[in-house]
Every structure is written in C-alpha cells, then in structure tokens.
Regions:
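Acidic, Ser/Pro/Thr-rich low-complexity regulatory regions
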Residues: 1-127
Length: 127
C-alpha cells in the first residue's frame, strides 16, 4: 500500500467536489484506489453529496459519473463521513449507488427529497 501525500489530499478534495474525474484522481493517487493507505482520509460532508446530486440534476455530470463517484467515496479508504452526518449520507448513497442497475429509476422529485434529507441531516427513505 502507498501512503497519501498532502498534494494528493488536495486531489481528494477536488474529486469530492467533482472538479476532477476518477481517472485524474487515479493518475494522482494510483490506479487501484481501494489499496491506498490513507492516515487522514478526506471527510465527506452532506453538502458534498448535495453538490453531486445537483450537478447530476443540472446535467453537468452523467449518471455513470455520479454512480462512480458514489462508489469511490463510499467504498474506498480515501474518504470518511462525519459521525453526525453518516446516517443521512449513507441513506442517500445507498439509493444513488443503484442508479446504474437496469430497472432503477430515480425521479427528479426523489433527487429533491434526497437533497432535503441531506440538508436537514435526516435519513432518506425511498417511497
């Protein structure tokens, strides 16, 4: 496992905000994002997830890019969630992560409800 540098922490911040792509993050940190030792992981905030949803709603990122982002921030050691925000964040990520499945349809209204749940720090419950 490789250790992460301060410059790479900046790259994590940029990826968190979707200002760089996964491939750009891999160029900075390493191809296998699941095997990078990170003593100080980047903390994902509820506002970061809201930003990702809004970028998707506005057409700035694709569904695939959103799902890829969810998988990186949720399933690598590079990112963590603040304990008081974790339930709200995970309740939304759990739904967003399924968006690439064949029968998954998430409406604009559901995306808005996810933003509301994140903004109020409550768990999102799909209908």
């Amino acid at each position: 496992m490789r250790k992460i540098t301060k410059n790479q922490l900046t790259d994590l911040s940029l990826y968190c905000e979707l200002k760089i792509s996964k491939s750009e993050l891999q160029q900075a940190i390493g191809e296998d994002l699941h095997n990078v030792e990170c003593k100080k992981a980047y903390c994902i905030k509820r506002s970061d997830v809201v930003n990702a949803i809004q970028l998707y709603k506005n057409g700035a990122i694709s569904k695939d890019a959103l799902v890829e982002w969810v998988n990186v921030v949720w399933f690598t050691e590079l990112f963590v969630f603040d304990d008081e925000d974790a339930d709200s964040i995970v309740s939304v990520l759990g739904v967003l992560e399924t968006m690439d499945e064949d029968d998954a349809i998430i409406s604009e209204n559901e995306l808005s409800e996810m933003i509301t749940a994140l903004t109020s720090n409550t768990e999102y419950t799909p209908l």
